[in-house]
Amino acid sequence: MSMNMKKTIVGLLTAAACLLANAGVIHFDDLPGDETLPIAAGYAGFDWTNMGTVRFDAWPGSGFEAGTVSGDNVAYNWYGAPATVASSDGGAFAFTGAYFTSAWVDQEISFEGWRSGQQLFASGAYTLETTAPVWIQLDWAGIDTLLIYNSSPTPWAMDEFTVPEPGSLALVGTSVVGLMAARRRRKA
């Protein structure tokens, strides 16, 4: 294998590692899990409207328990009302996805992605059950607000809220630019 081929392979592997290793996952496990408390504005860089956390064992046999993917807590929407997750500083973010489970009865959940008051994205409806979490992956970039609404006036549970860290995107971009420069130099 030629030296140039080795460099290309190493560069591609580095770019791939940046994408995989640096997803920011919000687990909610560093919060108290007291269902009477809201998630504080600014938590993990977001403002959480109409949302709290609850411990997995607060309601045995519920979707809160079934929907806990990691640790002890899940986030949920108070009283089954629509919830929003907005960037605390007003900047854009990318929402990869999260695990969702219905707390009490099967229901549907939908999403909208907004930026500066303009709707950029809207999802179809996803069915949530009470017995197991469903991974919902949207991969929406450039939003500053995520609106989550559901068909039933009962709560849903959310865990593993995943957003890529800006640093990982910059590393990938740097790797790609480096690969392009190396290929141009080799062709010259």
Q: Language-model features: where?
A:
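Bacterial N-terminal signal peptides that target proteins for export
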Residues: 2-10
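N-terminal hydrophobic or amphipathic segments with adjacent small-residue motifs
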Residues: 5, 17, 111, 167-172
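Bacterial N-terminal signal peptides
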Residues: 11-18
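Residue-level detector of transmembrane insertion/anchoring sites
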Residues: 12, 79, 87, 173-174
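Sec/Tat signal peptide C-region and signal peptidase I cleavage site
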Residues: 19-23
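Surface-exposed, well-ordered secondary-structure segments
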Residues: 24-162
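A short, hydrophobic C-terminal helix/tail in secreted or cell-surface proteins
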Residues: 165-183
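Short, charged juxtamembrane terminal tails flanking transmembrane helices
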Residues: 185-188
